[in-house]
């Protein structure tokens, strides 16, 4: 766990001044205790994806940060992820409030 946190913090420090979202692999060396599912992601309906086997963390850096940050996890688990309205759209709103 310490190694994972170090990895994430290292990348966040590198992108401190970046304004574009940066996508980082959640588990660069593969998911621990993987269930063995493989295959590509599928768009099952507009703005919903499924079959996520290589999850990522996307960092949205606020243009004028106020020192706060939030972690959002779009709902759906393995079946469907609502990436837009529970992910990208909310991240854009938080960035507008100065929250990374």
PLM regions with names:
Residues 54, 70, 87-91:
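Generic internal hydrophobic packing segments that stabilize the cores of diverse globular domains
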Residues 62, 75-76, 99:
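Beta-hairpin (beta-strand-turn-beta-strand) motif
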Residues 67-76:
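Short beta-strand element of the alpha/beta-hydrolase
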Residues 83-100:
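Short amphipathic alpha-helix adjacent to the substrate-entry channel of hydrolases
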């Amino acid at each position: 766990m310490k190694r994972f946190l170090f990895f994430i913090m290292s990348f966040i420090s590198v992108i401190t001044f970046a304004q574009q979202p940066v996508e980082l692999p959640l588990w660069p060396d593969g998911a621990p205790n993987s269930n063995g599912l493989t295959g590509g992601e599928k768009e099952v309906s507009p703005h919903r994806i499924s079959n996520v086997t290589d999850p990522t963390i996307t960092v949205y850096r606020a243009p004028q940060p106020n020192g706060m940050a939030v972690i959002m996890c779009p709902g759906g688990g393995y079946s469907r992820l609502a990436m837009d309205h529970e992910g990208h759209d909310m991240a854009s709103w938080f960035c507008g409030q100065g929250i990374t």
